[in-house]
Amino acid sequence: MIDLGISKIALIGAVALIVIGPEKLPRLARTVGTLLGKAQRYVNDVKQEVNRSMELDEFKKMKESVEDAARDVENSIRTGASDFEKSWSETTGSTSSDALPGFEAFPEYRNPKKKWRLKRGATPQWFKARSGIRTKAQSGAARVARFRPQPSRKA
């Protein structure tokens, strides 16, 4: 960067005072300060963006290396399983696929279904009554109509 010492800054200030004048110098100094601040923030933003992109590239490389390692492990497991399958078929005289049909693929994940109705029905009635759980649902309008005082009829 530019090497600015106190003597150079004082010289620049004196020249600016002579050229610009004492009336406009404070306004110019504020403007220069705000512009330098904006430039500094812009440079910091650019640095942060460059650092983020570099980290993103590093993460991508790391992800690729982990995926490659996972593929290598999967391939080694498959080759080991196929070698075991061959040796098993040689010793027993039959393949495991003949003995267990339909079990070649991995089992599919099924999301366990929540049994909230069963849990709700398992709560005792005395507990529901004491804790204030409503057992009979009623709409808001029906509740208002039920508890609204009836107008007295004049004959």
From Swiss-Prot:
InterPro entries: TatA/B/E, TatB. Keywords: Cell inner membrane, Cell membrane, Membrane, Protein transport, Translocation, Transmembrane, Transmembrane helix, Transport. The chain crosses the membrane at residues 1-21. GO terms for biological process: protein transport by the Tat complex. One of its GO terms (molecular function) is protein transmembrane transporter activity. Residues 81-103, 131-155 are annotated as: Disordered. Residues 89-98 have a biased composition (Polar residues). It is a single-pass membrane protein. It is found in: Cell inner membrane. Its main location: membrane. It holds the Pfam family TatA_B_E. One of its GO terms (cellular component) is TAT protein transport complex. PANTHER family: SEC-INDEPENDENT PROTEIN TRANSLOCASE PROTEIN TATA, CHLOROPLASTIC. Part of the twin-arginine translocation (Tat) system that transports large folded proteins containing a characteristic twin-arginine motif in their signal peptide across membranes. Together with TatC, TatB is part of a receptor directly interacting with Tat signal peptides. TatB may form an oligomeric binding site that transiently accommodates folded Tat precursor proteins before their translocation. Belongs to the TatB family. The Tat system comprises two distinct complexes: a TatABC complex, containing multiple copies of TatA, TatB and TatC subunits, and a separate TatA complex, containing only TatA subunits. Substrates initially bind to the TatABC complex, which probably triggers association of the separate TatA complex to form the active translocon. This is Sec-independent protein translocase protein TatB. It comes from Polaromonas naphthalenivorans (strain CJ2).
